[in-house]
Amino acid sequence: LDPLFATIQKEFLEEQTKLFGTDHIYGADPFNEVAPPSWEPEFLANCSKHIYQSMTHVDPDATWLQMTWLFYIDRHLWTNERVEAFLKAVPQDKLLLLDYYCENTEVWKQTDRYFGQPYLWCYLGNFGGNTMLAGNTKEVGKRIENVYTNGGENFSGLGSTLEGFDVNPFMYEYVFSKAWDCNLPDSVWIEQLADRRIGLKNQQMRRAWKLLYDSIYTVPAALGQGTLMNARPCLKGNGNWTTTPTVAYSNETLFEVWEMLLKAGEHRHSAYEYDVVNIGRQ
């Protein structure tokens, strides 16, 4: 390993701590969509061992935060033998893993629950800051309930790994509500959500959100999903993969939702106004 790595990391973390203090959690994502120089388990173990040790030179209480996208995107290369060697070279409970894309693939299931290291079940839900209405709500709920039951003692909570903020807030509110009450039926949660967003009990609002839940939020977000209004101009088609304008629902159904929201009445609750504008623009 390059001896400068530990030196540079030490100086960086020291300066960062001077500026911001520390919560003793440090993010490092080696080999993210990059192949290591060697795939030998011993080499991979040596890498992770030295990454963590260089953190402890600055903070003896350091915990390493690592996303596990690499185990998903290069799964054919990251065999369980290699994953185990990489993870177990760090002291137990000093590595916190983000299972990055669980609405699509739950890596914890493929890696014997990360061989005992703590991990968070994470909902990605957003590539590149797109603002489409998308999310496989019911499947996400089932997967969260399952990880609570079968995720092992090292399952440490829920997280989110979205690639853009202020987008599609419904799915993230849904996911994080499960951290507080995983057993609350979705039918009850949807009604409570509708009431909160308008500031009172309103049947039109409840029906609108029930229809969104049943008919709109049914499939996960796609890579490059976005409207043609946001696409680069072209004479034919949609240009390239970065803008995929297809949607998995009927716009007539979405228009019906919008009508219900508008019929809910004159309310100045900011969340309700957001919903009216958000559904309308879509």
Predicted regions and their residues:
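Histidine-centered catalytic/metal-binding microenvironments
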Residues: 229, 234-282
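Ligand-binding clefts/hinges and TM-proximal coupling segments of bilobed small-molecule sensing domains
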Residues: 224-228
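Catalytic-core regions of glycoside hydrolase
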Residues: 1-213, 218-222, 238-243, 247-251
